[in-house]
Amino acid sequence: MNILIQNRLIFLFLILWLWTGCATKPDFTAGEQPLDLTVRPEALPVRGSIWPGESASNMLFADKKARYINDIVTILINEASQGGNKATTNTSRDSDSAAGIDAFWGLDQSILSRNVNMGSKIKIGGSSSSTLKGTGNTTRGGQLKGTVTARVVRVLDNGNLVIEGRRQLTINEEDQYLIISGIIRPEDITTENCIFSQYIADARIVYAGKGIINDKMRPGWATRIVDWVWPF
């Protein structure tokens, strides 16, 4: 019987091992996607006019801020977040009850008189108490600083700019990606053509990577299988 159970366990682990071997590891390919190099179509000059149309290069009093598609702007990333939650529960309950019965299904009262400790009536009593105390506390924080140059990919009807920027860094076969996208207002751009990440609406900031270091941060497949199967 023990040999049969042992063989079943070996067969089960063999199936799990083959199943994990067939699984493919998802790769982080967000930084490898080709850039959208959409060029804004140039406005054709009006017949009989030499004005080529509005652009950043022919404005007499315009600065070099990003305004049009494919213009670039530098994003100063300085993100910090911190949150906490605390809960405390304290409950208590006590109850007592007592009852006396003169007659109980024709029980002979002489039985009570024979024992002085029982008294003259049938008595029923009980008490209960319960106490519950619980405390929970969680804290989480994160911080990200960096600089990345983004490109204007769309100009909205109200003049706001949709931007997208990516940076890929490879060191010793370890790839790191920094991706940022969102919507900015031209008036929030400084004279140095920079903008802080706090001024980006619908901001999406991704900082991730893949490589040996990233793989070592994850538990092995056997540990993950045991954690998934283990019910306790």
From Swiss-Prot:
Q: Where is the lipid attached (N-palmitoyl cysteine)?
A: 22
Alphabetized, the UniProt keywords read: Bacterial flagellum, Cell outer membrane, Lipoprotein, Membrane, Palmitate, Signal
Q: Which InterPro entries match?
A: Flag_Lring
Q: Name one GO molecular function term.
A: cytoskeletal motor activity
Membrane topology reported for the UniProt record: Lipid-anchor
* Entry's Gene Ontology BP terms: bacterial-type flagellum-dependent cell motility
Lipid-modified sites (S-diacylglycerol cysteine): 22
Main localization (coarse): membrane
Any one annotated GO CC term: bacterial-type flagellum basal body, distal rod, L ring
Signal peptide (UniProt feature, chain positions): 1-21
Where is it localised?
Cell outer membrane; Bacterial flagellum basal body
Q: Is the keyword Signal assigned to this protein? A: yes
- What family, per the record? Belongs to the FlgH family.
Q: How does it assemble?
A: The basal body constitutes a major portion of the flagellar organelle and consists of four rings (L,P,S, and M) mounted on a central rod.
Q: Which HAMAP family match?
A: FlgH
State what this protein does.
Assembles around the rod to form the L-ring and probably protects the motor/basal body from shearing forces during rotation.
What protein is this chain from?
A: Flagellar L-ring protein
Organism in which the protein naturally occurs: Syntrophus aciditrophicus (strain SB)
Q: What is the lineage of its organism?
A: Bacteria, Pseudomonadati, Thermodesulfobacteriota, Syntrophia, Syntrophales
Gene that this sequence comes from: flgH
